[in-house]
């Protein structure tokens, strides 16, 4: 997710009070079949069938599913929106979701389930029979949820409907337990494996649809339109609805779409997306999907990435908007194709996306920003922030913390986005551009559709450069690096 621009945050820092799938061998993927209907009053009724393949090395007696929409309910322990952004996110006043699980069955047999987790964020489904490694089971979940009116991943505004993280998705299983992180307001607190999706989405007929994957069918009926959508080997599925105009173009063989409702220069946004897919594909490895869609919507932050789909806030225009499009497109490689635990290792996709954005301006022509200027701005902003940070009695500049361990979105943004990009630039300067780029390509190829760990990136860079780089990475990650301005 793209936070507010670094230059804007640097100014804000001055006013702080004195105290932001499977890889390797081929394995069968799980599949989600979703049949959802959105009413005119923004109530979503859906049936999700998860044909779950146990790609873990241990047998399972139950499955856990994230219930992300529950985080928007009244009384939630954790709000998806930071306390200091509530007014911006809810301009019409606070609005809550209401989620109801109507029924759950496993292989056709009804099950008594439990909603648990730290914040009623987990659906626990007993399987009955043990599910051994490589075996498959089918879990059917019928539910309904009233969407909140909020400028966020899941919710609606006067101009659009965001369906991000709207369905029960299987929890990852790691180190002998299901990963059940709640919906923290800092960062993007998600972690999922790649799967196949077949989605039927029926919505009021005024809406056009932007979605992960390909829209393979569109059927109109009285006051409604039904979209058939397919996506293979993607880490998540999301959709955005609105009264959109659409432009499309090609980046190589990839169809690139831009959907918008308020843009005086839509061709610039489309071209930024096309250029990003082309440059990142050349520098990192080929974009693996047939289509990529950028969509304008009501959103609190600058943008939000989903596989083959990027939400871009309608609050931005001009060069700032183009910069956000580039950042979110970079996430198609770092998060979308190469996955990571976004709670524990958030720098692994955000720092990579931010530095990729800087590099974009090295190879693209006709844009306001340059690589050197972006790098200089990042260094100046980070040094200024750290000076203010120290004056406020804080000295932890480590990047190894989970997203909920940062004191604020501002601290998170500087440590993960800004410092993370500077770290990667230091690695590049240490090994040289040619070997650095070779390391990025190796990292992408080795971890495509899988879950990467920090050591995977370090290892790819070490193999490409034939140098020991772990101490360099760790000095940045652990907060030992000290940065100084040349001025």
Feature roles, as predicted:
Residues 12, 20-45:
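N-terminal, polar/Ser/Thr-rich
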Residues 24, 73-127, 214-220:
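Solvent-exposed beta-strand/loop surfaces of large extracellular or lumenal domains
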Residues 45, 49-71, 75-76:
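Ligand-binding face of N-terminal immunoglobulin V-set domains in extracellular IgSF glycoproteins
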Residues 87-102, 139-238:
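Extended, low-hydrophobicity, Ser/Thr/Pro/Gly-biased non-transmembrane segments
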Residues 188-326, 355:
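Hydrophobic helix-coil surface modules that form long, contiguous segments used
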Residues 267, 312-381:
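Zinc-dependent metallopeptidase catalytic helix centered on the HExxH motif
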Residues 350, 354-422, 430, 447, ...:
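Acidic/His/Gly-enriched intrinsically disordered linker/tail segments
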Residues 448-487:
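Beta/coil-rich, acidic/histidine-enriched accessory regions frequently appended to metallopeptidases
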